[in-house]
Every structure is written in structure tokens, then in C-alpha cells.
């Protein structure tokens, strides 16, 4: 069995660990790329969700409130006032323009 000096043994260990690390580099790079891709996707989802909540949802909410308020006004006050102050027969008559179309 050949004997080797401690320096040679340490060099052999370094070479062995270097070859081990060299074989691990592609796997580590793949893991880093995968992790980076997952983080990018997560950040994009969070940004879209925040945008939808802050910017995208506000106009929708305003339109919803406006439409609901108008609908409530029409059903509660407008129709009641029309029936109260107007001639019901006149309200139900077909306009001349509509009669010509028929």
C-alpha cells in the first residue's frame, strides 16, 4: 500500500470535493433557476391581485353602487311619483312613433 504525505492526502480530498461540486453545479443551477421562476410567478400573482384590489376593483365598485342607487330610485320614488301625479291611462298608451313602427 503506497503511503502518501498529509499534503498529498489533502490535495486528493480537494480534488475529490472539486469533482463532487463540479457535478453538483448543473443541479444547483437548475434548482436556482426553478426557484427564481417560482418567485417571479408568485410576485406577478401578488402584483396582479393588489392591482385588481386597488385599481381594477374601484371603477367596478363605483359603477355597481351607481347602478344600484339608480335602480332603487326608479323602483321606490320615480314610479311612485309617476303613478301618483300622472294619468295611468296616458302612461300606458303607445307613442305615435312606436305605433308607426308596428
UniProtKB/Swiss-Prot annotation:
Residues of the GED domain: 32-102
Domain of life: Eukaryota
Pfam families per record: GED
GO molecular function annotations of the record: GTP binding; GTPase activity
Name of the protein this chain belongs to: Putative GED domain-containing protein DNM1P34
Native source species: Homo sapiens (Human)
PROSITE patterns on file: GED
PANTHER family in the cross-refs: DYNAMIN, DYNAMIN-1
